[in-house]
A protein has these predicted regions:
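Active-site flanking residues adjacent to catalytic metal/cofactor-binding acidic residues
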Residues: 28, 51, 181, 210, ...
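N-terminal leader/targeting and accessory segments in enzymes
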Residues: 1-123, 127, 134, 353
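Phosphate-binding loop of NTP-binding sites
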Residues: 40-43, 86-89, 98, 102-265, ...
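Residues in the short beta-alpha loop(s) of Rossmann-like NAD(P)-binding domains
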Residues: 31, 54-56, 183, 267, ...
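Nucleotide phosphate-binding/pyrophosphate-handling subdomain across enzymes
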Residues: 16-24, 36-44, 344-421
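Extended acidic/charged loop-beta regions that coordinate divalent cations
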Residues: 85-87, 144, 197-239, 274-347, ...
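Short gly/ser/thr-rich secondary-structure transition/capping motifs
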Residues: 5-11, 73-81, 122-126, 185, ...
């Protein structure tokens, strides 16, 4: 395996005269994501310090074990308790854990001071995005190639199911797949394990499927996923973000400049994240509970003639062509091609229950198609997927009554759709 070079570099600035990639990092938070960032930085020769708002005596045995591993790997310093500005001395980048709200003290004041000192603030996903770019450059420098598809999933509800299902579909299509992010493991942990097991960069995963929370996205700046979806938006985590607009803006950062945007057309908040001007420049695919209304879209069709069956359908595009959705054109009159709806699978044939899961399945299909995978292979994986624990999981049927574990239903937006199964 080749050594990565400039893994922390901004790809846009890499060739600028005098540009130097950062090499002095302060990691905030001794959790899974913070530890992954610290390990990645140390692995790549950076100077690393760590700070956590908890007292050392409050750390769990697992956290103490992590701390020991980091100190053995070369961690320069670890601070516990209230953040103070002296921690910023010589720091070029702060790596912030998703558990730390930027609007709550002491984090808010600390980050404000960091910005005054022109210190960058990165999420773990920003480290990941730069690492993937560095791997591509390294492979190219050795006459190789590494350009994996990155499929990203966010939304208030349905992230884990859609992420896991997308990974399953891609695997059934014969690809090497890594699933990581909010779903666990941390993206950098999965990246490090993949690097450790690969003989060369070309042996790395073909496709990365990432579940991303608004917490992770807020300080992500250079991710340019192949395709990404926002499944839905309802009020959640407002104590962390401050208000609904800030929450939505964080979610919207999942779309890079070249990302295929996969949008829930039945959710006005989701559709409102893409302006009319942007729609003329972006590749967009929609999914929803209605029949598709444009080429390449996904939806649900109710067939009264067949006893009221709901079908997952796709406004089919030519499988022989590269499956990139068409960009919408403004101020150009184009005669619409007649839609050719292809019935994919009855909704009742899915092993995951409920209309909301039918929408999750459509989003997963759209993501996998955006990665260039043939529909017929994806449908085999769709039929097999049994869902994730605690998400409308059938436990037993006793005397005609079905008992369901939906203990992950912790907000109104999550519970409501289950009652309309």
């Amino acid at each position: 395996m080749h050594n990565l070079e400039n893994t922390f570099a901004n790809p846009i600035m890499l060739n600028d005269e005098g540009y130097q990639a950062p090499n002095n990092f302060l990691i905030l938070g001794l959790g899974e994501s913070g530890v992954a960032m610290a390990k990645w930085c140390l692995r790549n020769g950076a100077k690393v310090s760590l700070a956590d708002t908890r007292a050392r005596e409050q750390l769990s045995p697992r956290q103490l074990a992590w701390l020991g591993e980091l100190e053995f790997a070369g961690l320069q310093a670890a601070h516990f308790g209230v953040f103070n500005d002296s921690l910023l001395a010589n720091v070029e980048v702060i790596g912030i854990s998703p558990g730390l709200s930027p609007i709550q003290e002491p984090t808010q004041s600390f980050l404000a001071q960091a910005q005054k000192e022109v210190i960058d603030i990165w999420s773990e996903i920003e480290f990941f995005a730069r690492a993937i770019a560095a791997m591509g450059r390294t492979a190219k420098a050795h006459d190789g190639k590494y350009e994996p598809a990155i499929l990203a999933v966010t939304g208030t509800n349905g992230k884990t199911t859609t992420t896991a299902l997308t990974g399953r579909l891609c695997e059934r299509a014969g690809k090497k797949v890594a699933v990581a992010g909010n779903i666990s493991p941390a993206a950098l942990d999965r990246l490090m394990s993949a690097l450790d097991s690969a003989d060369q960069i070309e042996d790395m995963p073909d496709i990365w499927v990432l579940e991303l929370s608004s917490f992770q996205l807020l300080h992500t700046h250079s991710l340019n996923a192949t395709a990404a979806t926002i499944l839905n938006l309802t009020q959640d985590h407002l104590d962390w973000h401050g208000d609904m607009q800030a929450y939505a803006n964080a979610k919207a950062k999942i779309f890079g400049p070249n990302t295929i945007c996969i949008l829930n057309r039945n959710d006005p908040l989701v559709m409102g994240l893409i302006s009319e001007a942007q729609k003329t420049d972006r590749s967009i695919v929609t999914f929803g509970s209605s029949r598709p209304d444009e080429q390449g879209a996904f939806g649900i069709e109710h067939d009264l003639r067949a006893g009221g069956i709901d079908w997952l359908v796709w406004a089919e595009v030519d499988e022989e062509l590269e499956p990139q959705p068409k960009r919408r054109r403004k101020s150009v009159i184009v005669e619409d091609e007649p839609l050719r709806l292809k019935r994919l699978i009855p909704a009742d044939a899915l092993r995951i229950r409920g209309r909301h899961n039918a929408l999750n399945a459509l989003a997963a299909l759209a993501l996998a198609r955006a990665a260039g995978l043939p529909m017929n292979m994806l449908l085999h994986g769709l039929r097999d997927y049994q869902g994730e624990p605690h998400r409308v999981q059938s436990i037993a049927i006793i005397e005609g009554v079905e008992y369901v574990d939906d203990s992950k239903g912790t907000n109104v937006g999550r519970v409501g759709p289950r009652q309309n199964r």
